[in-house]
Structure formats: structure tokens, C-alpha cells
């Protein structure tokens, strides 16, 4: 929904999900957002594994500015959809483990994309210090994601 909000009324937002139970929840949330926001992008949902629905995705736009992949296995998806990115378009991959970051990196390069950044995001709670000011609280750190960001710099 955050992506839809950033696109505003002039954007095109395409979601792809192969699992009906996940799609149903997401689509209900999108409808609630559409009903409560003044501007909402043109939204299209495509059902199926992303590798198998590229032609249907392409019916909504020839090129995309961004693609976000949240999958357990990225290489086949990257290979399938990298051509959907316009020049300057970026792909973000949420990876469950570091070995998947490496495989996503290799797949992105093989697909003609340039890896801009790869790393881990962490959650760290802050609180008031006893003598004033703010500081990280003592305690466990929360892992939020391994990410890889790649960009299409040219169309070959």
C-alpha cells in the first residue's frame, strides 16, 4: 500500500501473487486504501508465478520504473522480468538468507542489470538515556531483511 500511495493518481501499480490466500488479503487492503485516499494509482493484479505471467504483466505497461521481488528463490524471476525495467528502472530483491543475495546478485548481472547495493537492514530500538539524550536500548537487535538493489542502465 505504501507503494500505491507514493505513485499517486497518475501511476500504474501491478501486483503479482501466485497464492490466492495471500492475494485475497492484499487485495482487500488495497480496496480499503483506494476507498480512503483521494488519489490512487491504476491497480492491476496478476495471479500466478511471476515467471509464468510476464506477457500478462506487459499488457499493463511496456516498461516499469521499479520491480520488487519478495521470493524464496530469485534467479528465475529476475531472468523473467528484468526486461520489463526501463532504462534507469530499479529492481529490489528481498532475500531470506545471504546465499539468496549471492544468487540474486549473479542473476541480476546475468540479466544485464548493475547491482547498486546489497546488504542487511536491522531494527534497533532507541530510548531516553538516564542522563539525558537518546541512545540505542540494550537488548536484541531485530533483523528485518537482506536486500539487493539493481538497476537497468541500458537496453541491449
What are these regions (language model features)?
Residues 12, 16-74, 130:
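S-adenosyl-L-methionine
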Residues 154-156:
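Flexible, glycine-/basic-rich loop-and-beta segments that form/coincide
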Residues 9, 32-33, 64, 110-112, ...:
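Short, hinge-like loop/turn segments at secondary-structure boundaries
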Residues 10-11, 89:
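A short helix->loop->beta-strand "cap" motif at the edges of active sites that frequently abuts
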Residues 75-151:
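C-terminal substrate-binding/active-site "lid" region of AdoMet-derived donor-dependent transferases
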Residues 1-9, 82-83:
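Conserved SAM-binding loop of SAM-dependent methyltransferases across substrates and taxa
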Residues 1, 22-24, 101:
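Short alpha-helix immediately C-terminal to the canonical SAM-binding loop
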